[in-house]
């Protein structure tokens, strides 16, 4: 996500990430401040993790202010103590805040050390940030032992094969496609676009969690659209193209899949190719009718003329020219007949 938001941990936070794994720190709070991840507060271990939980976490959770909370559990893994990542993004948060925190979480995990984070909670209500909320989350989302990356890929392929429906709605499934889940901010951005708040959305697949996130929601002039296309990573885009055609005003939603060739990894190319069908179906389930799907490898292609031609291809007038048919062949000189006299 750092490719889009540019938000990374500041020097103080990076230094504390190294220090907090000594076993003495129980919890730390991280927020996005001045376009960087910053350490807001931290508390030392006092009792066991269950007794410390509500006493230390509750004071860190503010009503309408999103944050990340990293909480040290008491069991160990090969790299040290296991940690819980609590992402607190309340419903009252703005769409921009939701997008920022969803888009920056992968960077936070990477800089803290993904292998140390063994559990995650995405909380939108204060009840979900309590010990009871954590215990309920464990019950609701209890799962088998973690799979390797290869096992996860195979499981996704099998799941997509099982879910393929050969009935009337087969066209919505895309045979062999992977149905990546979408984040809450992504769903909200689609709803907002349907209501007319934006004319452009850009989406990214988080390859680590295999989830689709919105990374840009804006009103973009058609002339500035090519500059929105990344040159080093694949993306999905939605653009509301308003134009005139044959005297009629049309509002056409164009789904664009941009893939800048071999600058992307094989896994990235495979994921974007596999997810585009199910994702476009998800978009339409949000009430947005896609008029045209376009694939490009260069943002410079995405001009007003190009989109117009894709929506309204020119019909070539190739009527065959028929020559005048020839008359019957000559049968010799015409005979003159005298009219007979009337008696």
Swiss-Prot record:
A GO cellular component entry from the record: cell cortex
Molecular function GO labels: actin filament binding; actin monomer binding
Span of domain ADF-H: 4-139, 177-312
Cellular localization per UniProt: Cytoplasm, Cytoskeleton; Cytoplasm, Cell cortex
Gene3D superfamilies to which the protein is assigned, alphabetical: Severin
UniProt KW keywords: Actin-binding, Cytoplasm, Cytoskeleton, Repeat
Domain of life: Eukaryota
Family membership noted in the UniProt record: Belongs to the actin-binding proteins ADF family. Twinfilin subfamily.
Protein name as catalogued: Twinfilin
Organism classification: Eukaryota, Metazoa, Ecdysozoa, Arthropoda, Hexapoda
């Amino acid at each position: 996500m750092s490719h889009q938001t540019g938000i990374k941990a500041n020097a103080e936070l990076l230094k504390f990430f190294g220090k907090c794994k000594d076993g003495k720190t129980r919890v730390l709070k991280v927020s996005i401040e001045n376009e960087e991840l910053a350490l807001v507060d931290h508390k030392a271990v006092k009792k066991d993790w269950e007794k410390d939980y509500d006493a230390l976490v509750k004071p860190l959770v503010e009503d309408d202010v999103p944050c990340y909370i990293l909480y040290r559990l008491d069991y160990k893994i090969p790299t040290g103590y296991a940690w819980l990542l609590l992402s607190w993004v309340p419903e009252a948060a703005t769409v921009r805040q939701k997008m920022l925190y969803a888009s920056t979480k992968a960077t936070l995990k990477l800089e803290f050390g993904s292998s140390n984070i063994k559990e995650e909670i995405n909380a939108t209500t204060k009840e979900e940030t309590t010990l009871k909320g954590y215990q309920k989350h464990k019950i609701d989302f209890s799962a088998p032992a973690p799979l390797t990356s290869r096992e996860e890929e195979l499981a996704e392929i099998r799941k997509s094969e099982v879910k393929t429906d050969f009935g009337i709605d087969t066209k919505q499934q895309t045979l062999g496609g992977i149905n990546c889940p979408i984040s809450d901010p992504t769903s909200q951005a689609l709803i907002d676009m349907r209501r007319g708040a934006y004319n452009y959305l850009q989406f990214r697949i988080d390859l680590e969690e295999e989830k689709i996130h919105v990374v840009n929601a804006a009103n973009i002039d058609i002339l500035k659209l090519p500059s929105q296309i990344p040159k080093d990573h694949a993306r999905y885009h939605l653009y509301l193209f308003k134009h005139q055609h044959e005297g009629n005003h049309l509002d056409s939603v164009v789904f664009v899949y941009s893939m800048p060739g071999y600058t992307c990894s094989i896994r990235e190319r495979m994921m974007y190719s596999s997810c585009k069908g199910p994702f476009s179906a998800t978009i339409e389930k949000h009430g947005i009718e896609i008029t045209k799907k376009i694939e490009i490898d260069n943002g410079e292609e995405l001009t007003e003329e190009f989109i117009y031609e894709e929506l309204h291809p020119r019909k070539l007038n190739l009527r065959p020219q028929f020559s005048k048919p020839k008359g019957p062949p000559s049968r010799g000189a015409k005979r003159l007949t005298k009219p007979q006299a009337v008696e």
